[in-house]
Amino acid sequence: IVHRLVGSEMCIRDRYKEVPNFEVHGYDRYLYQFISKEFPDEVDFDFKKMNIMSLDIEVQCENGFPNVLECAEDMLSITVQDYATRKIKVFGTRPYKNTRDDVEYILCDGEEHLLRAFLDYWIQNFPDILTGWNVELYDVPYICGRLERLFGEKEMKMMSPWNIVHDEEIEIKGRKNKVYNMYGINVMDYMDLYKKFTYTNQESYRLDHIAFVELGQRKLDHSEHENFKAFYTNDWQKFIDYNIIDVELVSRLEDKMKLIELAVALAYDAKVNVRDVYYQ
């Protein structure tokens, strides 16, 4: 058992770590010990009552693909979908002709207005689980990075219902990435869930390929444009449709595969946070 010293942050294990042949073993994840003790029986849950949201962003690419470590390019749009209602909300910086009853388009006067409008919506609708394709390594860090860059750390921390957001740099396959832990929200990247629970190797884990393999559907093609910059510059209407379809594809993957539902069931069974199922 790992005991904590009175009046000190140092635990017994730390105190004796320099002593030769004196190993102290124990489990110091006290939260899970508390949960196990207080809830010894099986915990019932209603998946339908969970607030689950899918998110996808689009960013300018004036200087190549946006670098998440720098967050130097302006954001163009943010699209979110509520899994319970299936309603889609789009925050965009240019006019868009909306023809769908399930889509609400919020026209914003530039990026700062877009981020403030999104943050207002976010604070009123904090999700229990946030998902999307590569959302943990791209969408979330880019939103947090731009909020901090434009408005400061205090406003960025409003992404957490507890106003606690920690960031760290991690290395994946030799490449540096930044992740943000928004306390109170479980970010369940659907790409990671797919890799974890499908037990198959794919030639590509791009959303376009996986959606075609699993659903027979693809992302909206924009090959008629010379590059991505030409796409959002010259065809904003289709560009927003492209953003919406990316969110819908992730929802359709969940409808078929129910990987989020599986992760939640495992988490309740093991009495851990949903993100911890990655490590089982």
Predicted regions mapped to residue ranges:
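Conserved RNase H-like, two-metal-ion catalytic cores of nucleic-acid enzymes
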Residues: L31-I129
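Common nucleic-acid-contacting/processivity interface regions adjacent to the catalytic cores
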Residues: K229-Q280
